Amino acid sequence: MHNFALKGDWLVKDLNNNKNWLFELDHQDKDEIIEATKHSISSRKKLYDITKSYFPLNNLISKINMIQKQLDSGFGFVLLRNLPIEQFNDEEVKYMLWGIGQYLGYPEIQDKAGSLLHVVTDTGSSVNKTDNIRGFQTNEELQFHTDGADVFALLCLRNAKNGGLSKLVSSVAVFNEIEKTRPDLSEILQEDFYFDSRAQNPNDDKFQKVPIFVK
């Protein structure tokens, strides 16, 4: 068994020494995003029907390409600052996030309702009450996990009154540490485990059988 030799293997000290994961939008970038967002809204297309052609970007493409490279072969995540969300209401900001996302990948259905974008908000429920409730609909702390898509994005509309912090960890670094200290467990973690599917697809089994780590 060998360690995963990937650039996604990082510790906090690596992030402090190398800020390639941090991207700041300047005034020109923001103006271009504002105009693209207005253009997509004025098209009167439904959110899921918005493609690159309805969200035109030009000067920002080079920065988006750098973001894509960082996601694919860098640390595996980025922080994008200064999105001009104050120019729009919450529904309009969805067009901004969706439009930028069109330049980074293809949307993937996230649940049985066919949702491609979720609003993270507390509905007063709990994941322990019903299979139909997922973590982003509660105020409960979510444990470290990975989602099914290759890339996902979180956009902060406003600071939470309490909590709302996001934490990241390198799954590659976690595996390599287990491989170094407990190689017997690294073998087991590459075997199948049962996970609650949270009723995301009516045609799926209630539980999914997948390994925790996959090469």
Where are these predicted regions, by residue range?
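"Short basic amphipathic alpha-helical interaction patches in structured regions
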Residues: 91-98, 168-170
